[in-house]
Amino acid sequence: MKVLLLGVTGNVGSRMLPALIAHEHQVVAFVRTPAKISPEATSKLDSIVVGSASDIAAIKAAILSHNCDAVVNAAGVAAMTGLTSQGEFAAIFAAVVQGTLEAGQERGGAPIRCWFMSGFGILDSPKKPYLLLD
C-alpha cells in the first residue's frame, strides 16, 4: 500500500516511518523541511513532497500525484503540546480531512484510508497544568 505520511520529521512520524516500512508499505513523506529527514530515512522513502500540512490543495495533489492508497497524519502533534498555537492543530486536521475527501472524490469516490493521531489532544501535557482539550 502506498501511504502519504504527514509529519514524518516529528516525534510520532519519525517512529511511524520504520513501522510502515517494516510492513512493506511504500511511504511518501509530506514535510515542510525535507532537510530534517535523516539520510537513513530518506533512503527508505518512495518520495518526498514539500508542503504545509494545513494546505488542502497540496495534500490533495500529493495524494493524487503519488497515487496514495492511505494517509497517516502525525502532523500537528506539536500544536497540541503548546509548542505552537492550538489554531494550527485544528487547521492541519481540517486540511487533511478535506484534502483526502477531495482526492477520493476526484478519483471517482474510491475511499482513501486515513489515520489521525488525534487522540493525543486529550492527553495531559507536562507543558501545561491542564488537559489540552478541557
Please report, for each region that a protein language model flagged, where it lies by residue.
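N-terminal Rossmann NAD(P)H-binding glycine-rich loop of SDR-like oxidoreductase domains
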Residues: 2-25
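Conserved Rossmann-fold NAD(P)-dependent oxidoreductase catalytic core, especially the SDR/UDP-sugar
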Residues: 95-134
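NAD(P)H-binding glycine-rich loop region in Rossmannoid oxidoreductase-like domains
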Residues: 29, 36-98, 102-103
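Short glycine-/acidic-enriched loop or helix-start segments at secondary-structure transitions
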Residues: 15-16, 39, 82-83, 124-128
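SDR active-site strand-loop-helix element
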Residues: 6, 30, 74-75, 114-120
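Structural motif
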Residues: 2, 69-70, 113
